[in-house]
Every structure is written in structure tokens, then in C-alpha cells.
Swiss-Prot record:
A family per Pfam: Aminotran_1_2
Protein residues bound to substrate: R20, H132, T355
Gene this chain is encoded by: bioF
Subunit annotation: Homodimer.
Biological role: Catalyzes the decarboxylative condensation of pimeloyl-[acyl-carrier protein] and L-alanine to produce 8-amino-7-oxononanoate (AON), [acyl-carrier protein], and carbon dioxide.
A molecular-function term among this protein's GO annotations: 8-amino-7-oxononanoate synthase activity
Catalysis performed (reactions): 6-carboxyhexanoyl-[ACP] + L-alanine + H(+) = (8S)-8-amino-7-oxononanoate + holo-[ACP] + CO2
Modified residues (N6-(pyridoxal phosphate)lysine): K241
Protein name listed in UniProt: 8-amino-7-oxononanoate synthase
Amino acid sequence: MIEDHLNTELAEIASAGLTRRRRVLETPCGRMATVDGTNLLNFASNDYLGLAGNADIARVLADGALQWGAGSGASHLVSGHLGPHELLEKEIAEFTGFPRTLTFSTGYLANLAVTPTLAGRGDAVFADKLNHASLIDAMQLAKANGAEVQRYPHNDVAALEKMLAASTAAHKIIVTDAVFSMDGDLAPLPLIFALAERYDAWLVIDDAHGFGVLGPHGEGSLGHFNLPASPRILLMGTLGKAAGVGGAFVAGSETAIEYLLQKGRSYIFTTAQPPAIACALAKSLQLIRDGDALRANLMDRIGQLRDGLAGLPMKLLPSPTAIQPLIVGDNDAAVALSKALWERGLWVPAIRPPTVPKGTARLRISVSAAHTEADIAQLIAALKELA
């Protein structure tokens, strides 16, 4: 039968304790979630500023749909680039300090547009080993284009420099997450940027988990490290995490963005997002810009969680961000701990291989500005009870 090999692989996934299943939420994304009639404190989403359920954003989204219709009808380069898209791109450029941006339907598509478009035969890509899956796929596409691809040990700047120094490639592209999605740690961007300058390389930064959260006004990891909007940087940010809506952008120089517009396949051959999404994101951007209190509360809750879990036998990785990984190790043990928390009204997902390396199954605790001091205290108490 044609499906036999699929059933065999599915059985292997199940026997390894790696079967994934979707949870159907009966309430909007927010601090609380209702699943199968159970009310839960939500520590699973990437809604870092609590904007996904923001009523003002929702009203702008609805008004935008009434004014601009339900869909864009085409790709950006045919007839799908409407006024709200153009306005949003200009506002993101101003906010991030770059001359120009392009918007995409997802961060995955944005990442697929950048590295494979920049890198071809005779070029070289240098990528952190813990980069997001979308960056890994982008790297593979660059390899298919003829580029040489090397992966350096996680955040190992010395190893990266050795690779750059030994390379004779015509063009060099360094690719890294800014905040690593499963560990929550930061890339040493000032050191990596210095290497990009020294070896005349592009620096592609995925700031999916930094945009809106880090920096003096939420502008992201570059602001956090006080780095310039350099012409050699291409910055990707997602708009469905801290921004609370959906989509992504790539920011860069006028020339680099024009090049992506002309040659980026995942930009050219994708229908543009509904214009109402762009309307909602313009409102979200305003709330991020004015969101100092939200970010301050988020950092307070992160500090409270880390202080409260400091004595646990399980290792809490050294993350300064909203992503707080608690290493359990064994796949089944991680799932069992997640289930026990669920039974106590706390939704904390277990993350297992292949998303993370074997032997490092973990709880991925996502902290939000919407969480209260009491919420964090409840989670700490439950983990101490179960540890």
C-alpha cells in the first residue's frame, strides 16, 4: 500500500514518545486559555506583550477589513500591494532605523527570501548550529544554489572567525538568530557584527523573539546592543509574537531590499497578506513604541520566575528573555511534567527532539507582560511541588 512507509514512520514517532498533537483553544490567545473545557494559565504562547487579544488592535483589524476588504487578491508585485502594506513598511523602517523594509506573510517565508537570494555559487554561508528551522532550510536552499555552507558551534565567535578567515568566497553571509527560540539566550551580536565588518560579510539576523521586547523602545536586539542599522545587516522580525498579529518583515538598506524585492522567490510568488492585517500591525507598532510599562512588567515577571526556580534540581537555562527553558532531559519525563502542570491549571509545553537535541527535552516556559505576580507564583509553587 502506498501509505505503508508513512504508517511505519508514524509508529516509530509514537514509540519514541515524539507524537505531536494540536490543542484547540476555545478562547482567544491571552493570559488564560480554555482547552477542552479546562481553564488554564497560558505559559505556551509567544504573545510576549499580551497584544494578541488587545481590543484596540482587534477594532482596527475589523475596521481595516471593512475599508479594504478581506484579501489582497495577488502578490505584492502584481496587484496585491495596497495602501496599508506600503504605510506599514514605511513605519517599520522608521521604527527600526533602516531605510526600507519588505513585509511577508510569515517569518519562515521572510527567512527563505534572504539567504538563498544573497548566496549562490562562489559564496559562503556561516550559520549558528542552533538557528531556527527556517534559517536551516534557507541555508539548504543556498547550498542548492551552489553556495558553500558551514555551521559554527552555538555562539562560538572564535570558531566563526576561523571559518571567515579561511574562506576565499566572493561573498560571505553570517546567519544567526538574535534570541534563540528554544534556549532563550542572546547571540553575541556586537562581536559577530565586528567580524562581519572585519571580513566584509553580510549579517543576517533573525530577531523573531527580540522585536517588540528588547531595546529601549522595543525596536529589538540591535537596540538592545546599541548596534547601528548598518548596510551590511539584514534584519528579520516577526509580527505574530510580541506584535500580537501576524506576518514578518525584513529591514535593510535601500539596495539590499530592492534586490530582495526583485529576486526573493518567497516574496515574489506569495499572495500578500490581507490589508487589514497591515492596518492592525500599524496599531500594534504604536503600542510597542509606547510600551515601556509592558516591557518593564515582562522583565519583572521574568526575574520573579528565575528567582523562584533557582533552587530546583532541574536546570533553568541562563536566559534573560521571555523564553525560559527548564531542562528535564528524558522525553517521557518532560511530557509527564507538562501533563502534571496541565492538571494543576498550568499550560507549559514539553519540547522534545528533533526540535531540541536528544537528552535535552524541556519545558519551554513563555512569560508574557500579561502575566501577574500571582500567576508566576502559582507556576513556581507547582514546579517546586512536582520537582
